[in-house]
Amino acid sequence: MLKILLPTVMLLPLISFSKKEWMWINSSAYSILISSLSLLTLNQHMDLGLNFNLNFFTDPLSSPLLVLSCWLLPLMILASQFHLMNESINHKRMYLILLVSLQIALLMAFSAVEFMMYYILFETTLIPTLIIIARWGNQTERLNAGLYFLFYTLLGSLPLLVALIFTQAQMGSLHILLLTLTPNPLLNSWSNDILWLACMMAFLVKMPLYGFHLWLPKAHVEAPIAGSMVLAAILLKLGGYGILRIIIILEPISKFMAYPFIILATWGMIMTSSICLRQTDLKSLIAYSSISHMGLVVAASLIQTPWGFMGATAMMIAHGLTSSMLFCLANTNYERAHSRTMVLIRGLQMVLPLMSSWWLLASLTNLGLPPTINLISELMIIVSTFSWSNFTLILLGLNTVITAIYSLYMLISVQRGKMTTHSLSINPTFTREHMIMALHLLPLILLTLNPKLILGVAY
């Protein structure tokens, strides 16, 4: 674990002391090396061996998310270069230092061995993200978005803190492995349903579940490119990871509490997918698409079958890469047209033909076409929910159809149609942008060859 954490910490002095012209090169190259090194945590056995100490450990559930965090840091650095072109050197340094600080908090959160440690790091990720949104966002509404983001997350996670203190008092420990192995005495009291709700609420707000989702479109739309990427790809996964971890100590799950949330998640998928159909703002459409996909993860996690757990873990990785790629593509359009409205940036296929190929691939990946891991994760989740209730097949089938419609609607709106007058004078694409897209798409396709790397502990 330290072989990833220490080099990431050393990025901070590297960024601080690099010369102006070398800062981007040093940080990009060094973070790519760290992401290559993190691949060693994949494909390990359940006997923890060298990946375990008293504070941090990695297992088949946390290591894919750990690798995803490391993989996205160089991509965020590459994607932010144009956005920060007119900023002073100190502001650029501050921006990169915030990204690396967020990365360190995420790495420690995904490998924390105790729930209280996880909770503290879960809250720590809030600070750099809030500063990135509030300082480097595009419009003045960014302050409003920052407030929504802060208060939704804080109010959702306060009951979790109380629940963790109560669990510590009852069981004497919050160690993840210890709680997994001990019989659960928490079920003897009538207050177990309240405890379950308190534990889940923080993660359901972070996912977010439909109904608690109002902060997400605002935060996504106002955040700069790196903020949108890390929010969609990794911060939402903190919620899914927390559910998969904490559900172990809440077993056996009470039908009285689980059923309403499974129903709300499946219904929320239909609702948010339908909202996508009438969006005019490109980033807002991708944000609502994220809520729809995270609804699948919530439903699969709460059903608590091995296939459900595997599908949820695979969906988190697949969605992380896909939504991050879509936000990068939306950003390339925004940098050229200075607008997120799809009507104003149509007809780009004629001007940027290679970029339209990336748009096509990203849209097809988003709707779950083979040979991507999105298909594998969706099939696993559909099978596990169908085994729980036959009726869910109608809802999930409808959701799949609507997802295909809005993905293709997004593609046609941006790429096809009559070109606007300002489309003729836009800049050509850069090699840097093509590299970012390729590095997003490569793992999505390659993981199909060996999906057990990302199927988590249930495999």
Swiss-Prot record:
The enzyme's E.C. designation: 7.1.1.2
What this protein catalyses is: a ubiquinone + NADH + 5 H(+)(in) = a ubiquinol + NAD(+) + 4 H(+)(out)
- List the lineage, top down: Eukaryota, Metazoa, Chordata, Craniata, Vertebrata
Q: At the top level of its lineage, which domain of life is listed?
A: Eukaryota
Regarding protein family, the annotation reads: Belongs to the complex I subunit 4 family.
| InterPro entries (UniProt xref) | NADH4_N (IPR000260), NADH_Q_OxRdtase_chainM/4 (IPR010227), NADH_UbQ_OxRdtase (IPR003918), ND/Mrp_TM (IPR001750)
Q: What does this protein do?
A: Core subunit of the mitochondrial membrane respiratory chain NADH dehydrogenase (Complex I) that is believed to belong to the minimal assembly required for catalysis. Complex I functions in the transfer of electrons from NADH to the respiratory chain. The immediate electron acceptor for the enzyme is believed to be ubiquinone.
Query: Which keywords appear in this protein's UniProt record, sorted alphabetically?
Result: Electron transport, Membrane, Mitochondrion, NAD, Respiratory chain, Translocase, Transmembrane, Transmembrane helix, Transport, Ubiquinone
Any one GO BP annotation for this protein: ATP synthesis coupled electron transport
Cysteine pairings via disulfide bonds: none
- Give the species this sequence originates from: Zaglossus bruijni
The encoding gene: MT-ND4
Membrane topology recorded in Swiss-Prot or TrEMBL: Multi-pass membrane protein
What protein name applies here? NADH-ubiquinone oxidoreductase chain 4
Q: Name one GO cellular component term.
A: mitochondrial membrane
Pfam families (alphabetical): Oxidored_q5_N (PF01059), Proton_antipo_M (PF00361)
Molecular functions (GO terms): NADH dehydrogenase (ubiquinone) activity; ubiquinone binding
Its annotated compartments are: Mitochondrion membrane
Q: Which residues cross the membrane?
A: 22-42, 65-85, 96-116, 117-137, 146-166, 194-214, 230-250, 256-276, 284-303, 308-330, 350-370, 392-412, 435-455
